């Protein structure tokens, strides 16, 4: 057995080795290449088929030999790089294939072309045989075309990179190809033989009848092959980048508005007069003097060089008449153009800036003859650098314009020097200009930038790089970097580091890391020691070195500072207004053009020397060229005005000699041979950077052109091909106008044609043949996709391979215990079926016009049919029906109804519509209706009725009106004469003429049957029936008489009711006696009917008893409550009455319903009564408690206005209390509904675990004390709490246990298990975990109890306790004043849990999950004004919170704030004062008066303001009121938005529901404080400039007022210190606000200036339009992510309005149709009020525009938690500062300190810019150095103990000895220190599975591929 397995294993391994061997892979690859059939196969087959005889055999041999030789060369090219470059480039196809194919095409058609006669002496001298050989050889080198060769080429590249024995691979692949080729040729030969010998083919009738067909076929074989060759030729013609077929777009010299990223040309033509330059043009590098004066437009395309006539010409719109454009072929990939000054205006030049010409300009002189006069024009310099070490090319490609210039002559000096190869460069650039649109590239427009970046191919490039000290293969290595490295290696001798072995390299890496770590550690310790010695902390802090500008006496801006990197180089946008730019002299704008010295290394020496000789007179002084090149490349681009005066603060950057040299270079004037002067004003050094190429053209689509996109008043041609569209004329204004007689105004809409879109926005002239693999399997494929997206498309049943539904059906019982399938009620199933049916109908309706479009002339036929049907219906069919009906009535002796019928017939109108249903008019047909098709809409369709009502009702009832509304007043006519509701819809049923007649007959028939049944029945039934009829008849008479004489009949009714009661009582007593006697009777005597009644009574009696007992309990349980918890009334009739009603019914019905009744009553008992009892009890208790607390609060505040010490005790905010009530009620009410939000999280990743750990207090029983001593009514047993001890792993602990626990393995695991399901909020979990997964987990876990829904497990019990108890924030006893100064400065929850035993009676304050008692901060009111250095952490739980800083990559002061409680003030102070807004300043007096406006209810909402609190209005009930959409983002959820306010939740406090619910659901996304203010900032800017100390900044502003709203409810004594706090210590924030406003004002000025310029040119735009545009631009500029959208419902209603308006415009008397349209809601009147001149603000007010939220944080929930995890070491101030005015006044230089603020602090905290809480010593170092230190500690930890050996955090003794400042307060107990250690050094010491966090955070990278395999597991142990 062992032997067998051994042999089997060896066999498998042997097979694997063989399969993976190089030979087998090569054979496989070679066999694959057999199927890559190229054009050479045509020649090979031609030789096989056509040639016969001796010469034919020789040709076959030569063809095969050439074929194999060519393939061998292809395989050799795989191994031999130069051959591969030659054959693998498109040059080969262009140079070889096209001429050769064309030559063969002509040769085969002219047989005598090469016919020299046959020479049989030596067959090899025969030219035709040699040609056959050459054909097969050369054509084999061409690219294959039947199977794409790219796949095989990639296979080769990958395998060549992998395998070692490359030559063996090449040889084996050739052998494989040879085998495949031989097999293929043998198969072809067999097929030919079979065709010749097959009798069935010969005996074919067609072949026999055409005797000469076979001979003709053989004779025309040459022609067939020549046709095939021609097709191949055309195919290749399409694939090459040829300039002949593809269209080169003319680059338009339009003066574009470009925003902030505009660029300028490098060549500036200096004139005797000062040039007027455009707004944002930069200085140029070379000034060339010319005698002409030129005014230039705003921005000139770099690749356009316009040569102007001698006359002065303003460059404007129509320049093309006077310009000749010399279009340059741009650089290929190697030459990347540098940006000059765009970084100053655009922080990301690689994305948003245009291409510039290369700085390496080569002179070129053009001599231009204009109208016979010779004139020397400007010199232009262009370079063309090839990809890899090719010579430098120049461009001399001209675009000739014969209209303006007779002769253009270009004298090219350099070309003359080059000699024979002068043609080389123009030819290559002509054929291979990569900037031409001859590739199917998309032009993807950005919303902000019109020009677009080119879509380059993705760079998958294999190269070796070092990672973690080892050589690794990187597949995303930038190829430009590798070629750059190769160039450098050829030019310079680099250190021979690569010769070292990998182990030596790794050791070297470890050594350098250790050195770095030691240096950092030493520096760190030195700084801490200096702190211990008492130095100022700001001197100890590490500050980054900054570049200093001596001339300006200021630091260089961070964005330009080369020393700073990473996040410091943020985005700064500098803008200059046009007036300032015009004033600044051109001398400051001019930059010189100087060669980047690094090109000395890259370019070939000859060219470089030639260049130096041409432009550099200092050529002989080569001694400094290389030195300066090294020096200059170190320096980045500096500020343009002070390039010569840059110094580091400290030692000088340049030595004296270098400084002289610089000065000499900077002020040099270079003279060129032709006498022009080039002034070098300054020296600009350029960084080597890769630049994303950007198209210089601004393209528009076909659609934009047709819709009238105008560029500076000139309608330009489109360059992007859109989907085919048709213009449908809606309305033609034919009114004759004396001024414009020829002008006819057309109003038209655009319609897409029903055909596949193969254009797909491709640029004109781009190649089509390369767009392969588009599949079509429908009649109409709107978007042709490749099969790659097949799985994302809606599959047809034939192609759907999804068996998941089948698997669910089969294995649904295996899906886990308790999984339940949803029970659909009958109504739901019906609704679903109806929905499916409607979907099918809609699909058919859409596909029908597609079928019509496919059939030729179908639209014409259908249009004619419709018109015929319309005429027939209107004038023949309907009148004839009317005549027949009325004749029939006359014959039946009925009065005829001619007038009524013809009146209805006249009402019917046939409206001609467009093909899509846009109504035009009754008489006018749309233009081109025969070709494009029409629809005919019938208004008020005539329906023939047998009779009309004789007397119409005076007042129609509501039901009748509803019926009339439901009745459709319009339909469309089909080609078959039927009616349909929608165009191409299914025909609808017509109301039958005979239906009402049959109804009457049916009623008669039923009456006859009933009477017959009545007559045949028994006497008893007759009597009962007569009695009932008489009783009802008498009752009706009595009612009528009681109206006449009410008093008499009321007395009678009272008397009768008494009698009936007596009768009832007697009946019941008789019944009971009868029942008791019945028990004695024998059962045999019963009739079947009596048995049924007895059984029924026996079953129902216990049910009745139960119902009675329940109602009694209910009455006892809720004595004082009359209303139910939710606003529905449970008016259930008493069971007695129900029984009486049922008893009166027929016994058959009772018998059927007995089971149902039982189930129904049990349901009522379970679902309603117990629920009501429990809810009612809870609410009564809570209401009583709340009223008690509110009364206490009012009393206390009234009595203690000036008593400062007792404020703490009274500081219970009712909103906190209410929120706790609401939270508990919400949990109880929604625990069943939201139970899917809490679940078992066994698969949670470590990041979430550590997030939880960072928020958890010490694991001791202090916190459980509050659970045990919870003062509310407990719904739990003590045993459950004891059980929970075991789950936390602390069952063995005792209450007095205060020692900090050691975290071994067991404690770690137990700790993770017992953390309350990682207490994140419900909202957070719902965002993190997919909904379906949650549902499946929870289906089996929900357990119910009658009084409480208890969820999941014992841990959830603790979670509930935690929700009720741990949101209770405790304060110390206010009598102990000496402790209050300390305790308020750290975390209240931590303090409570740690020091619980030492405090006897902590005061409970109820806290909201969203808020914290910021008023507790009052006790910062120190007796002595001693400034504390550090604030201890206030670690408020952030369950439902995301702050501004939590959003990744946000700047410190964005225009949007993300939920700071400061922002809510704009909302609450204006509308509602819920909290006591108390503010105490540290510097204020103790006896400061505090005025608080408490518990003011919701004020009346002012209708003149934008903000409306209509969030909870039901959309269906309020369809016309669109105001609720304005702030719909508050809820973020449409379902919540649609919920009505009459929800069960929180109905006791309706005054708080609106405010609380808005912020409770998803509070982290709130619009900017300036959002609404900026909508009307034209009015506000001037007002907001002067914010003095007394004014408050309000975030909210009424729309019709022009002053800033001042805050109320503050007295003056409080206001002054508050103002100091607001505008003094917070001066920076205020400054930022002013800065924002001033910037916005500048933006508006710029926008207006641009508009004025435009208006001066076009003179057509109206003022209103410009105002709207300015407002919109201002709004879009502020909100970087575009958030404006319009309401979808509004869009549909506007379309409906348009359709009806089109009809009404064409009607002479539109009144009737207008009224009916309004009644049918086809016209929305509220939309018609929207004027064209409405501003953005008004549109938002009306609900037309909606502000969308930025959902960054919601999408990045997981990332947010990761960042929270990593930022544990960070101590930040409370994010929940509700009191906006409070600021602690600090005396530390903010500017200097901000420099050392790490990036992630902006994510997680420090939003007040008070970064002074340095409890963690690591913050001494800068962020980058801190990261370095941490990661080095990890990488170099050989032993696990080394991880924890950071000297600062070893143990308490070390902390005391080394760093006493940590323990500055001796009152800190040991537990507190241990807690600080845990929380603030958890960062670098925890286990982290999700190392993407480390990757993003520590290394400033976003690419996680390098770290995917890395895992760090330090031991979590603090000794």
From Swiss-Prot:
According to the record, the segments passing through the membrane are 18-38, 67-87, 90-110, 127-147, 175-195, 224-244
Function statement: Involved in protein precursor import into chloroplasts. May be part of an intermediate translocation complex acting as a protein-conducting channel at the inner envelope.
| Composition skew (Basic and acidic residues), residue ranges | 1606-1623
A GO BP term, please? protein transport
Q: Which gene encodes it?
A: TIC214
Q: Which organism is it from?
A: Panax ginseng
Q: Where is composition skewed (Basic residues) in this entry?
A: 1107-1117
Instruction: Provide ranges: composition bias, Acidic residues.
Output: 259-269, 278-288, 297-307, 316-328, 355-366
- UniProt lists compositionally biased (Polar residues) regions at 1626-1636
Region of interest: Disordered: 250-375, 1107-1129, 1606-1636
Q: Which domain of life is it from?
A: Eukaryota
Q: What are the record keywords, sorted?
A: Chloroplast, Membrane, Plastid, Plastid inner membrane, Protein transport, Transmembrane, Transmembrane helix, Transport
- What InterPro entries does the database record attribute to this sequence? TIC214
What is the protein's name according to its record?
Protein TIC 214
Q: How does it sit in the membrane?
A: Multi-pass membrane protein
Q: Name one GO cellular component term.
A: chloroplast inner membrane
Provide an example Pfam family for this protein: Ycf1
Which family, according to UniProt?
Belongs to the TIC214 family.
Localization in the cell: Plastid, Chloroplast inner membrane
Query: How does the record describe its quaternary structure?
Result: Part of the Tic complex.
Q: Which coarse location class applies to the principal site listed for this UniProt protein?
A: plastid
């Amino acid at each position: 057995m062992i032997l067998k397995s051994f042999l089997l294993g060896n066999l498998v391994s042997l097979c694997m080795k063989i399969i993976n061997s190089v030979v087998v892979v090569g054979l496989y690859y070679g066999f694959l290449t057999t199927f890559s059939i190229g054009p050479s196969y045509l020649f090979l087959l031609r030789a096989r088929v056509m040639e016969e005889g001796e010469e034919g055999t020789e040709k076959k041999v030569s063809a095969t030999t050439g074929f194999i030789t060519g393939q061998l060369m292809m395989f050799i090219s795989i191994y031999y790089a130069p051959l591969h470059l030659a054959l693998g480039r498109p040059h080969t196809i262009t140079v070889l294939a096209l001429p050769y194919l064309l030559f063969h095409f002509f040769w085969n058609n002219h047989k005598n072309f090469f016919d020299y006669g046959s020479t049989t002496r030596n067959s090899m001298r025969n030219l035709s045989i040699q040609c056959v050989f050459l054909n097969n050889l050369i054509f084999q080198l061409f690219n294959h075309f039947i199977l794409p060769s790219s796949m095989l080429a990639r296979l080769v590249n990958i395998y060549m990179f992998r395998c070692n024995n490359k030559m063996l691979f090449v040889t084996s692949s050739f052998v494989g190809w040879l085998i495949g080729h031989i097999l293929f040729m043998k198969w072809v030969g067999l097929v030919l033989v079979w065709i010749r010998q097959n009798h069935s083919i010969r005996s074919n009738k067609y072949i026999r009848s055409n005797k000469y067909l076979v001979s003709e076929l053989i004779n025309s074989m040459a022609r067939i092959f020549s046709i095939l060759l021609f097709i191949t030729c055309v195919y290749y013609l399409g694939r090459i980048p040829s300039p002949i077929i593809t269209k080169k777009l003319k680059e338009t010299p339009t003066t574009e508005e470009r925003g902030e990223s505009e660029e300028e040309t490098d060549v500036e033509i200096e004139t005797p007069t000062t040039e007027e330059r455009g707004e944002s043009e930069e200085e140029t590098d070379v000034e060339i003097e010319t005698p002409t004066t030129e005014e230039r437009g705003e921005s000139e395309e770099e690749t356009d060089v316009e040569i102007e006539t001698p006359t002065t010409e303003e460059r404007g719109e129509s320049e093309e008449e006077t310009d000749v454009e010399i279009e340059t072929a741009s650089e290929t990939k190697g030459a990347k153009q540098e940006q000059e000054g765009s970084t100053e205006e655009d922080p990301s030049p690689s994305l948003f800036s245009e291409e510039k010409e290369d700085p390496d300009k080569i002179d070129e002189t053009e001599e231009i003859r204009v109208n016979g006069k010779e004139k020397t024009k400007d010199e232009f310099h262009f370079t063309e650098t090839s990809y890899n070490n090719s010579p430098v090319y120049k461009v001399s490609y001209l675009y000739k314009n014969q209209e303006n210039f007779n002769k253009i002559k270009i004298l090219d000096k350099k070309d003359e020097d080059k000699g024979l190869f002068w043609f080389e460069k123009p030819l290559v650039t002509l054929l291979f200009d990569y900037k031409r649109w001859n590739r199917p590239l998309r032009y993807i427009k950005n919303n902000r930038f019109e020009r677009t970046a080119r879509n380059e191919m993705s760079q998958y490039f294999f190269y070796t790089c070092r990672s973690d000290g080892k050589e690794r293969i990187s597949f995303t290595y930038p190829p430009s970097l590798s070629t750059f490295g190769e160039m450098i290696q050829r030019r310079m001798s680099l250190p021979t580091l690569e010769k070292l072995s990998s182990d030596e390299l790794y050791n070297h890496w470890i050594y350098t890391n250790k050195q770095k770590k030691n240096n950092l550690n030493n520096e760190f310790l030195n700084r801490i020691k200096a702190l211990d010695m008492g130095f100022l902390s700001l001197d100890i802090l590490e500050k980054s070195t900054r570049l200093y500008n001596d001339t300006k006496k200021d630091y260089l801006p961070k964005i330009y500072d080369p020393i700073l990197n990473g996040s410091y180089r943020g985005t700064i946008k500098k803008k200059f207004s046009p007036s300032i730019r015009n004033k600044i002299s051109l001398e400051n704008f001019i930059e010189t053009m100087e060669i980047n010295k690094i090109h000395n290394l890259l370019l070939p020496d000859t060219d470089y020397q030639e260049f130096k000789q041409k432009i550099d007179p200092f050529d002989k002084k080569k001694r400094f060229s290389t030195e300066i090149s090294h020096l200059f490349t170190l320096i980045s681009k500096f500020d343009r005005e002070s390039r010569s005066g840059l110094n580091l603060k400290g030692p000088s950057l340049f030595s004296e000699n270098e400084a002289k040299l610089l000065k000499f270079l900077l002020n040099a004037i270079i003279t060129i041979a032709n006498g022009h002067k080039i002034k070098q004003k300054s020296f600009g050094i350029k960084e080597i950077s890769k630049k994303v190429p950007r198209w210089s053209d601004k393209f528009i689509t076909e659609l934009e052109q047709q819709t009238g996109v105008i560029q500076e008043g000139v309608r330009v041609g489109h360059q992007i091909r859109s989907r085919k569209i048709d213009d449908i004329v809606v309305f033609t204004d034919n009114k004759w106008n004396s001024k414009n007689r020829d002008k006819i105004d057309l109003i038209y809409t655009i319609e897409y044609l029903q055909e596949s879109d193969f254009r797909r926005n491709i640029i004109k002239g781009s190649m089509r043949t390369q767009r392969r693999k588009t599949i079509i399997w429908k009649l109409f494929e709107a978007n042709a996709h490749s099969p790659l997206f097949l799985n994302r498309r809606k599959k047809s049943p034939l192609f759907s391979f999804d068996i998941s539904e089948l698997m669910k059906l089969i294995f649904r019982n295996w899906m886990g215990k308790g999984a339940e399938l949803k029970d659909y009620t009958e109504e739901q199933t019906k609704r679903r079926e109806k929905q499916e049916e409607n979907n099918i109908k809609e699909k058919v309706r859409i596909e029908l016009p597609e079928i019509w479009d496919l059939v030729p002339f179908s639209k014409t036929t259908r249009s004619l049919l419709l018109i015929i049907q319309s005429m027939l219906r209107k004038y023949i069919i309907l009148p004839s029906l009317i005549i027949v009906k009325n004749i029939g009535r006359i014959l039946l002796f009925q009065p005829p109804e001619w007038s009524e019928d013809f009146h209805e017939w006249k009402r019917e109108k046939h409206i001609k519509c467009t093909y899509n249903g846009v109504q035009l008019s009754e008489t006018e047909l749309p233009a081109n209706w025969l070709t494009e098709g029409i629809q005919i809409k019938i208004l008020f369709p005539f329906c023939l009725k047998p009779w009309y009502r004789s007397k119409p009702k005076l007042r129609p009832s509501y039901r009748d009106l509803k019926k009339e509304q439901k009745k459709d007043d319009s339909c469309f006519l089909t080609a078959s004469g039927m009616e349909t509701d929608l165009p191409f819809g299914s025909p609808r049923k017509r109301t039958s003429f005979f239906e009402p007649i049959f109804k009457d007959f049916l009623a008669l028939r039923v009456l006859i049957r009933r009477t017959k049944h009545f007559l045949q029945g028994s006497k008893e039934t007759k009597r009962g029936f007569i009695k009932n009829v008489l009783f009802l008849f008498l009752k009706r008479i009595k009612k009528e008489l009681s109206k006449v004489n009410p008093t008499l009949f009321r007395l009678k009714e009272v008397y009768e009711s008494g009698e009936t009661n007596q009768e009832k009582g007697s009946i019941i007593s008789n019944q009971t006696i009868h029942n008791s006697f019945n028990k004695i009777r024998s059962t045999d005597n019963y009739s079947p009917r009596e048995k049924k009644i007895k059984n029924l009574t026996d079953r129902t009696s216990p049910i009745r008893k139960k119902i009675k007992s329940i109602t009694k309990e209910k009455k006892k349980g809720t004595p004082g409550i009359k209303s139910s918890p939710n606003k529905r009334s449970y008016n259930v009739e008493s069971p007695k009455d129900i029984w009486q009603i049922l008893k009166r019914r027929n016994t058959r019905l009772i018998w059927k319903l007995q089971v149902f009744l039982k189930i129904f009553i049990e349901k009522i008992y379970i679902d309603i009564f117990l629920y009501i009892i429990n809810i009612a009890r809870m609410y009564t208790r809570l209401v009583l408690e709340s009223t008690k607390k509110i009364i206490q609060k009012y009393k206390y505040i009234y009595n203690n206005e000036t008593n400062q010490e007792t404020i703490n005790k009274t500081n219970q905010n009712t909103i906190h209390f209410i929120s706790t009530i609401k939270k508990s009620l919400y949990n109880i009410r929604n625990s069943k509904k939201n139970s899917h939000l809490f679940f078992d999280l066994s698969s949670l990743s470590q990041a979430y675990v550590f997030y939880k750990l960072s928020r958890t207090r010490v694991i001791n029983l202090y916190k459980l004390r509050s659970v045990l001593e919870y003062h509310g009514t407990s719904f739990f047993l003590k045993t459950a709490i004891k059980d929970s001890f075991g789950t936390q792993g602390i069952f063995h602990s005792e209450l007095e246990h205060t020692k900090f626990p050691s975290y071994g393995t067991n404690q770690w695991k137990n700790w993770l298990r017992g953390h309350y399901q990682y207490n994140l909020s419900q909202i957070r979990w719902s965002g993190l975990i997919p909904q379906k997964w949650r549902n499946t987990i929870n289906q089996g876990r929900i357990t119910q109890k009658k009084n409480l829904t208890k969820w999941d497990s014992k841990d959830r019990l603790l979670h509930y306790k935690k929700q009720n108890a741990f949101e209770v924030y405790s304060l110390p006893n206010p009598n102990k004043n000496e402790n209050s100064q300390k305790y308020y400065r750290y975390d209240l929850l931590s303090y409570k849990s740690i020091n619980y035993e030492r405090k006897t009676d902590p005061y409970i304050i109820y806290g909201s999950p969203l808020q914290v008692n910021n008023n507790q901060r009052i006790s910062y009111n120190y007796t002595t004004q001693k400034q504390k250095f550090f604030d201890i952490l206030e670690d408020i739980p952030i369950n439902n919170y995301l702050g501004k800083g939590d959003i990744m990559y946000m700047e410190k002061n964005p225009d949007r704030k993300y939920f700071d409680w400061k922002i809510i003030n704009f909302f609450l102070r204006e509308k509602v004062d819920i909290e006591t807004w108390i503010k105490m300043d540290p510097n204020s007096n103790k006896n400061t008066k505090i005025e608080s406006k408490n518990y003011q209810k919701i004020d009346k909402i002012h209708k003149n303001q934008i903000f409306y609190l209509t969030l909870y209005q039901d959309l269906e009930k309020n369809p016309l009121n669109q105001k609720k959409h304005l702030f719909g983002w508050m809820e973020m959820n449409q379902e919540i938005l649609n919920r009505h306010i009459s929800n069960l939740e929180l109905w006791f406090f309706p005054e708080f529901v609106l405010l609380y619910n808005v912020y409770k659901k998803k509070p982290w996304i709130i619009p900017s404080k300036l959002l609404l203010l900026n909508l009307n900032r034209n009015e506000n800017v001037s007002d907001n400039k002067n914010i003095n100390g007394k004014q408050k900044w309000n975030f909210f502003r009424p729309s019709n007022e022009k002053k800033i709203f001042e805050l109320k409810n503050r007295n003056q004594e409080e206001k002054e210190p508050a103002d100091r706090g607001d505008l003094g210590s917070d001066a920076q924030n205020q400054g930022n606000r002013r800065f924002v406003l001033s910037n916005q004002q500048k933006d508006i000025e710029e926008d207006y200036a641009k508009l004025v310029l435009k208006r001066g040119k076009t003179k057509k735009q109206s003022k209103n339009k410009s105002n709207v545009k300015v407002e919109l631009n201002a709004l879009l500029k502020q909100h970087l992510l575009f958030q404006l959208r319009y309401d979808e419902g509004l869009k549909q209603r506007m379309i409906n309005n348009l359709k009806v308006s089109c009809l009404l415009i064409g009607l002479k008397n539109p009144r009737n149709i207008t009224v009916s349209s309004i009644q049918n809601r086809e016209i929305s009147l509220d939309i018609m009020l929207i004027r064209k001149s409405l501003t953005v603000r008004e549109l938002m007010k009306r609900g037309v525009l909606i502000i969308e939220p930025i959902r960054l944080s919601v999408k990045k929930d997981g990332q947010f938690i990761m960042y929270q995890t990593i930022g544990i070491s960070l101590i930040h101030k409370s994010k929940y500062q509700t009191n906006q005015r409070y600021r602690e006044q600090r005396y530390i230089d903010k500017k200097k300190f901000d420099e050392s603020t790490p990036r992630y602090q902006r994510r997680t905290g420090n939003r007040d810019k008070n970064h002074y809480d340095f409890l963690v010593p690591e913050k001494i170092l800068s962020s980058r150095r801190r990261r370095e230190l941490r990661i080095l500690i990890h990488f170099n930890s050989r032993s696990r103990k080394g991880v924890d050996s950071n000297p600062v955090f070893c143990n308490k003794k070390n902390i005391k000895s080394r760093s006493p400042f940590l323990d500055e307060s001796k009152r800190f107990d040991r537990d507190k220190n241990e807690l600080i250690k845990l929380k603030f050094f958890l960062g670098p010491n925890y286990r982290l599975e999700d190392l993407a966090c480390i990757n993003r955070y520590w290394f400033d990278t976003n690419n996680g591929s390098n770290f995917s395999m890395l895992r760090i597991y330090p031991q979590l142990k603090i000794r």
